[in-house]
Regions:
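Short beta-strand to alpha-helix junction loop
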Residues: 60, 84-87
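Helix-loop-beta segment of a Rossmann-like dinucleotide-binding subdomain
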Residues: 45-51
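Active-site core segments that coordinate phosphate-bearing ligands/cofactors
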Residues: 1-4, 9-32, 37-43, 54-72, ...
Length: 308
C-alpha cells in the first residue's frame, strides 16, 4: 500500500535512469531540489522526507525500506534523508562569492513545489485545505494523522509534527484546453448561471487513466452526451471537475482527515469566479483564491516553521 506503486511513479522513473547508467558512473540519485542543495553545499547525497516519499522512503521507520534494494537500487545511490527544515550546513564559500551571497547563509532541507505552494497560500493549521487548479487538479489537507491509500492514489507528506494529505486527479485545465481556447473559456463562463445544474454527468479527462480519487489507469472519460450548445458543454465540464474535487475531499474525510470548511484555490483555474461559485454549490463549503501562491514564498517559510 505505497505510493510508489505504478509504472509512472518516481521509483519507476528512477529505475529507468539506473538501467540507462550502464557504466555506473552515477554517484547519487537526485531530485531537482537535491541537485540545487548539492551545488549550494558542494556536497551531494542529501535529500528531504517530502521529495523522497514517492521514491520509497519509509516515514514510519525514518529509513529506506528493505524491499527497495530488491528493485535494483544500489545503496550508495540513495540519499541521506532529513526532515523538512533540518539544518544541512552553511553555503559553500565559493558559491557564496559567485552569487554575491552572505557566506553565513544557512541551507535547510526543503520540500516539493506542491507542498511549498500549500505553505505559501494557506495558514499552517489542522484542516487547512488547498486545491490547485492547473493542468491537473490537486487537493491537500493538513492533518494530525498520516493517511494513505495507494488504491485510490492518496498519500501523506510529513511536515513537522503534522501530515499533508493529498492526491492529484488527471482532470483539470488540460481537459478544458482540449476543447476551448482561453478566450472561449472566459467568454462562455460569463454565460453560465453557476446556481443552476447543467444536468450533465461528466467525468472530465483528457485521456484514458485516472490517479485520484480512484487510481485506475483504464478509467475512460465520461463526456456523453455532448450538447451542441458550447456554453452548456463547458458548464458540464466545470461541474464534473467540481464533483471530482468534492469526491477527493470526501475520500480524505472517510479515512480520518478533516472535511474542509474553507478551501483556498491556487493555479490558473482560481481566476474563474463562475467556476468558484459552481464549486461552492457542489462542495458546499467556502472557497476563495490564495493571496500568496508562489512556491518560493512557502519555501522561505520553512526555516521559521520547521527550522532547527
Amino acid at each position: 500500500n505505497h505510493i510508489t506503486k505504478g509504472q509512472n511513479s518516481t521509483l519507476a522513473r528512477a529505475l529507468r535512469l539506473i538501467k540507462e547508467d550502464k557504466n555506473r558512473n552515477a554517484k547519487y540519485l537526485m531530485h531537482q531540489a537535491d541537485f540545487i542543495v548539492a551545488n549550494l553545499l558542494n556536497k551531494g547525497g542529501l535529500s528531504d522526507e517530502n521529495n523522497t516519499l514517492k521514491l520509497g522512503y519509509d516515514l514510519k521507520k525514518n529509513d529506506w525500506p528493505e524491499w527497495i534494494h530488491r528493485t535494483g537500487f544500489k545503496k550508495y545511490l540513495l540519499p541521506k534523508v532529513y526532515p523538512v527544515g533540518a539544518h544541512l550546513g552553511k553555503l559553500n564559500e565559493v558559491i557564496a562569492n559567485e552569487l554575491g551571497l552572505n557566506k553565513k547563509t544557512n541551507i535547510y532541507a526543503g520540500t516539493t513545489d506542491g507542498n511549498a505552494g500549500f505553505l505559501a497560500s494557506s495558514k499552517f493549521k489542522i484542516g487547512s485545505a488547498v486545491t490547485s487548479l492547473g493542468s491537473t487538479l490537486t487537493v491537500k489537507v493538513l492533518s494530525e494523522i498520516q493517511i494513505e491509500d495507494s488504491n485510490i492514489g492518496l498519500y501523506s507528506h510529513k511536515l513537522g509534527k503534522y501530515w499533508l494529505v493529498g492526491g492529484a486527479s488527471n482532470t483539470g485545465g488540460n481537459v478544458l484546453e482540449k476543447y476551448f481556447s482561453k478566450n472561449q473559456i472566459i467568454n462562455l463562463s460569463k454565460e453560465i448561471n453557476p446556481n443552476n445544474s447543467s444536468g450533465l454527468e461528466y467525468y472530465p479527462l483528457a485521456n484514458i487513466g485516472e490517479r485520484f480519487p480512484e487510481n485506475n489507469p483504464e478509467r475512460k472519460p465520461q463526456l456523453i452526451p455532448r450538447p451542441k450548445d458550447e456554453t452548456l458543454f463547458l458548464h458540464g465540464l466545470l461541474e464534473g471537475m467540481a464533483k471530482i474535487e468534492k469526491k477527493s475531499y470526501e475520500a480524505i474525510h472517510q479515512l480520518g482527515g478533516s472535511f474542509p470548511d474553507h478551501i483556498i484555490t491556487v493555479g490558473g483555474g482560481s481566476k474563474n469566479l463562475v467556476w468558484e461559485k459552481i464549486r461552492m454549490r457542489i462542495i458546499k463549503t467556502k472557497i476563495s483564491s490564495g493571496i500568496n501562491i508562489e512556491a518560493a514564498v512557502g519555501a522561505a517559510k520553512i526555516p521559521f516553521l520547521f527550522g532547527n
